[in-house]
Amino acid sequence: MTSNRKNENEIINALSIPTVSNPSTQMNLSPDARIEDSLCVAEVNNIDPFVSASTVQTGINIAGRILGVLGVPFAGQLASFYSFLVGELWPSGRDPWEIFLEHVEQLIRQQVTENTRNTAIARLEGLGRGYRSYQQALETWLDNRNDARSRSIILERYVALELDITTAIPLFRIRNEEVPLLMVYAQAANLHLLLLRDASLFGSEWGMASSDVNQYYQEQIRYTEEYSNHCVQWYNTGLNNLRGTNAESWLRYNQFRRDLTLGVLDLVALFPSYDTRTYPINTSAQLTREIYTDPIGRTNAPSGFASTNWFNNNAPSFSAIEAAIFRPPHLLDFPEQLTIYSASSRWSSTQHMNYWVGHRLNFRPIGGTLNTSTQGLTNNTSINPVTLQFTSRDVYRTESNAGTNILFTTPVNGVPWARFNFINPQNIYERGATTYSQPYQGVGIQLFDSETELPPETTERPNYESYSHRLSHIGLIIGNTLRAPVYSWTHRSADRTNTIGPNRITQIPLVKALNLHSGVTVVGGPGFTGGDILRRTNTGTFGDIRLNINVPLSQRYRVRIRYASTTDLQFFTRINGTTVNIGNFSRTMNRGDNLEYRSFRTAGFSTPFNFLNAQSTFTLGAQSFSNQEVYIDRVEFVPAEVTFEAEYDLERAQKAVNALFTSTNPRRLKTDVTDYHIDQVSNMVACLSDEFCLDEKRELFEKVKYAKRLSDERNLLQDPNFTFISGQLSFASIDGQSNFPSINELSEHGWWGSANVTIQEGNDVFKENYVTLPGTFNECYPNYLYQKIGESELKAYTRYQLRGYIEDSQDLEIYLIRYNAKHETLDVPGTDSLWPLSVESPIGRCGEPNRCAPHFEWNPDLDCSCRDGERCAHHSHHFTLDIDVGCTDLHENLGVWVVFKIKTQEGYARLGNLEFIEEKPLIGEALSRVKRAEKKWRDKREKLQLETKRVYTEAKEAVDALFVDSQYDQLQADTNIGMIHAADKLVHRIREAYLSELPVIPGVNAEIFEELEGHIITAMSLYDARNVVKNGDFNNGLTCWNVKGHVDVQQSHHRSDLVIPEWEAEVSQAVRVCPGRGYILRVTAYKEGYGEGCVTIHEIENNTDELKFKNCEEEEVYPTDTGTCNDYTAHQGTAACNSRNAGYEDAYEVDTTASVNYKPTYEEETYTDVRRDNHCEYDRGYVNYPPVPAGYVTKELEYFPETDTVWIEIGETEGKFIVDSVELLLMEE
């Protein structure tokens, strides 16, 4: 800093300094007399500390250097910047991080815990080592970008450092210690965002995947908002906590406001400009906020004279000082002339002071009219006023003496001398100083040098070149015996010419306008804008900006606006009164919301323009709204030739949208454009930048919506967006009457599926709902989804196409069924395979998927490589399947069934965007082929009808014979379980009741099958109702039975059998009966080995009967008429046997002489009955009961109980006794 002083001395040339009579009080005003780290503080009543210049200077230096490397800097600039940054934050001397922390602690008088301090400092030390290592690797790589080893090292160190700082940031925002840690947090957050920017600058050169670069970019955007909100929130909290009532509290309040603006808010204002996609070239940003140096009043009074310090000298209250000093929000202006008025305080000839008691300041916005403000006493001309000229001059440094005089016992505080050092930024040779100087001989003096509080950005150059702030205004604290000027300052980056330079994006805050139009107000900035902002609530213009165009007038520009709005609106721009842009802009916030970081958006006009004059006036206005709130932060002038990623995205989206439609008719959708592809184009449009192309985005959205409507109209599937999946119908009503006529109607109204098929909301792959089909543990019970396309939707002799998108699948079977079954089995690798469609990316703030992540482009030529019936190893997630339709018949309503099925445990599928569309009319060979197939199908249908008629007649006769009459509500008295099973077997000979591909789908004979099957179910229900033995078929093991000894229930031939292996074992059950009624005890059993198996029925006293089974006996038969059964015994011969009472084996014999080789397809293969070959029986309701194996014997007896309880006991004498069923049936009255 000494060298700076020498340069300045050469300019000032021994300015006169007022003399004092007492050498002991004479103030050394030599240029080297600076206070480096703090102003002198009083020995008593001290305020600790007023300033730490090294803390402030670090913040100023970093912000100043960042302003020079915004956008995309040159490689050399960036390497130099990182070297500077590491040197500033991790120098060889005292740790700046500790100084940051201590400085805020002293300002707010709150210390962090020792653990917090030690943890933070240690972690920052580690970050310093990581940054130094990264910086060195970066410089090495920049020297030779083609060196593979350097590239590998820099990438490795980048990833490690970024992760390290990401995890370190939370250590700098410990709960209840956020304010003292705030300056540390802001600097660390700044480092992180700068580091994340490097991924966008260099990531692809380092070998990062585009998805990784994008992920780092998304993190940068997200953390920019997070860090900004944190800094603003806790800055405001800390500032409000310091709000007090007296002058001393205001002094501390103002120091916090100034120092944390420099060390925190200035950085936050620059964060958005790190976005290289929005700012892809060098960018100039400007800080227009104002800060205030300390009042020029004595603060270093010696012990015993504390009242001579200005804040103790009957100073005004906190609120009075704030009202006098803090300027209301205003347009940025520059001082042009200062007139200072003086008064005299005289005690004696040796103790007197002329001092600053008031002033008039003339100031002007850029290109605007002159304004004047006055403060203090300005009508006293007994002492000649001093006028100082500042027009076109930056006052970069002030030096002021705070004097004190004692009048009787009352101290008087005032300023007898002040020097204003200036330079003309347009002419660096015009520099010097202008001085206010009055006679003074008082009791003490204190020098205030503005560079102590606002030091230059660097000591490498003279301060007239490296100054960071310029004087913008002067306030005055007024008390009875107190006058203390307060200087306000703006940052040097806010130039006074609004110059648009070449090859850069120029940001100009709108508070740099020359005027405000009616209805516009300047409001305080929210903390992250770097200054105040403009607001209006109705249609009109905001203001005019006088621009200085420092580029050829042929250069074309686009304009962007950073704004917040509670409504959709139109912005318009004018150059010299001529409208050049009008565009629609969207709402960014809700009315009544606080202004937050996310409230602001940067959006622009796509139409470029050029300036016609080197000095031009730019006007911004808004229209098409009323009674809403619109805020403007800044406008940006972007060279038109700059290619943004957003511009490339727009061009790509426009091509994609146009490619949806045919070249001959822009309102007609291409046939090969899938519904999934339209959704992806919609995502592409949604990801376009609102800031860059809002109007074009809206226009493209309308086109994509129209394409989506066309896609929906041509799609013959109902509910393609999967709003609902119906469960499987029960095709027989409770009373056994078929309700099949509604099946076709219901099947043609949306999707039907198994219970495990679920609808999922859209993800990063699907924009709309999709379905998942899981695996199954039993191939007889697959998970499925199906829908029928009704005949009325189809055209004769036309080819149709089923297509969709599969995220991933294994063993997914797809069928199209009409005359034949077109079939594919698809295995599609998922997103974590060799064919990823998207990358893992952060979700949005509301949990929405990130559909803007990079993914492979849609390629309609990639398709399934397999043919019908083959297992398909899909390399594309798109699938297609064709089917040809011949003649249509609305009465027959054959339609087309669309089926998806998983029948393996390992299988699964996620699919969506399903379409069934008309592909083309059939001609030539295809037409001939479908006609031939249709004829074969009809021939087979006729044969099936003949067979069905015969089988149906036989089955219906057998079913009718089970019941008393056609009401089907009462069984014949002699109907037994074997007869019911025999009838059911005949019913199941009706073929084509269900489709073999998915036997839950009704076939051509479903109606008659369900009719008869309903009667079978009724018969079983009636039969079960009259059998009073519980669990007589042992299907529930030994439930309801009493057991003595060792017995077991074993599965044999798909039946449950009771096995009694020992003669001492016994099984019994007490059964409630109706005394006086007749019952039939019927037992089906098998005896192995010697001895007898016995089933006994008895009451408590006597009335016992039994059935005996031997190994060597033949199966018993029974008389037809149970009304004459009183005369027969269990051992009667077979003469009385009737065919209705035939055993299971005879009843289940099948006549196959009239079988027809019918298959519901027109394939050339020999037909086989799929149901007979399929071990999975998909029978609705009652499942086919397996016949009793050979060797079992059925016997029965009549029994008339005399009490209400009988006992049935089962045992044997030796060998093994196997019992299939025990029935006790109530006789009909």
Curated annotation (Swiss-Prot):
<keyword id="KW-0800">Toxin</keyword>
<dbReference type="Pfam" id="PF03945">
    <property type="entry name" value="Endotoxin_N"/>
</dbReference>
<keyword id="KW-0749">Sporulation</keyword>
<dbReference type="InterPro" id="IPR038979">
    <property type="entry name" value="Pest_crys"/>
</dbReference>
<comment type="similarity">
    <text>Belongs to the delta endotoxin family.</text>
</comment>
<dbReference type="Pfam" id="PF00555">
    <property type="entry name" value="Endotoxin_M"/>
</dbReference>
<dbReference type="GO" id="GO:0090729">
    <property type="term" value="F:toxin activity"/>
</dbReference>
<dbReference type="InterPro" id="IPR048645">
    <property type="entry name" value="Cry1Ac-like_dom-VII"/>
</dbReference>
<dbReference type="InterPro" id="IPR005638">
    <property type="entry name" value="Pest_crys_dom-III"/>
</dbReference>
<keyword id="KW-0843">Virulence</keyword>
<dbReference type="Pfam" id="PF17997">
    <property type="entry name" value="Cry1Ac_D5"/>
</dbReference>
<dbReference type="InterPro" id="IPR001178">
    <property type="entry name" value="Pest_cryst_dom_II"/>
</dbReference>
<dbReference type="InterPro" id="IPR041587">
    <property type="entry name" value="Cry_V"/>
</dbReference>
<dbReference type="GO" id="GO:0001907">
    <property type="term" value="P:symbiont-mediated killing of host cell"/>
</dbReference>
<comment type="function">
    <text>Promotes colloidosmotic lysis by binding to the midgut epithelial cells of many lepidopteran larvae.</text>
</comment>
<dbReference type="InterPro" id="IPR008979">
    <property type="entry name" value="Galactose-bd-like_sf"/>
</dbReference>
<dbReference type="InterPro" id="IPR036716">
    <property type="entry name" value="Pest_crys_N_sf"/>
</dbReference>
<dbReference type="GO" id="GO:0030435">
    <property type="term" value="P:sporulation resulting in formation of a cellular spore"/>
</dbReference>
<dbReference type="GO" id="GO:0005102">
    <property type="term" value="F:signaling receptor binding"/>
</dbReference>
<dbReference type="Pfam" id="PF21463">
    <property type="entry name" value="Cry1Ac_dom-VII"/>
</dbReference>
<dbReference type="InterPro" id="IPR036399">
    <property type="entry name" value="Pest_cryst_cen_dom_sf"/>
</dbReference>
<dbReference type="InterPro" id="IPR005639">
    <property type="entry name" value="Pest_crys_dom_I"/>
</dbReference>
<protein>
    <recommendedName>
        <fullName>Pesticidal crystal protein Cry1Bb</fullName>
    </recommendedName>
</protein>
<dbReference type="Pfam" id="PF03944">
    <property type="entry name" value="Endotoxin_C"/>
</dbReference>
